[in-house]
């Protein structure tokens, strides 16, 4: 049953706990970021993002989003600094989005939903590989970036132009020479808290770093995301929309801010 999770009524986030009991755990993601209670922590360092040698390889429809995958066999694209004590290697990025522009993000800010959310997924190199890292409480660092409606994003355009070739689950296409820096906002102020993967197996292995400044995307660009399908080729067509998990209880955690 575990591989049948999704985002519909019968297999969506409300039901994930049946197969993945950690869904009700103490450090689940996403969360609502309440800016009034997030505490500025002067000890937090600036983020150090070195994506200059990032080697993108392919773009894949996995039936719940699409991943742009990177060569993580060496330190090509690295995230460190911020709340992190170690160096983390970029393995993939993906997005979550809505059926309309009024929803789609997983994290919310004072309950406000953005049109989409970008997740750049990195693993802690001290654990040797991604599979080992996800078993550790400090195994992953995920950089979350909100997408809000405004002027079109040039960086995003190259990604969107590849989507026609991966319309259905299981499709994969080559996707080289993409610079993930083109998806970063100008300001790297962030919130950070300990959390989890937002999709099954929902492992509690993520240091979340959510940027305060969104990037902008046009409404027309957003509509491209919705041309993808959850289903495999030849099956009944199900538009890939609303592939986001709602905010989870913060429980005993504190959200820290890198800015005043």
Curated annotation (Swiss-Prot):
Name of one Pfam family that matches: Carb_anhydrase
Signal peptide range in chain numbering: none
Family: Belongs to the alpha-carbonic anhydrase family.
Modification sites for Phosphoserine: 2, 87, 165
Residues that hold substrate according to the record: 198-199
Enzyme class: lyase
Residues that bind Zn(2+): 94, 96, 119
InterPro entries, sorted: CA_dom, CA_dom_sf, Carbonic_anhydrase_a-class, Carbonic_anhydrase_a-class_CS
A molecular function GO annotation: carbonate dehydratase activity
Keywords for the protein's UniProt record, in alphabetical order: Acetylation, Cell membrane, Cytoplasm, Lyase, Membrane, Metal-binding, Phosphoprotein, Zinc
EC number: 4.2.1.1, 4.2.1.69
Gene3D superfamilies: Alpha carbonic anhydrase
Protein name as catalogued: Carbonic anhydrase 2
Needed co-factor(s): Zn(2+)
Gene Ontology CC: one annotated term: plasma membrane
Catalytic activity: hydrogencarbonate + H(+) = CO2 + H2O; urea = cyanamide + H2O
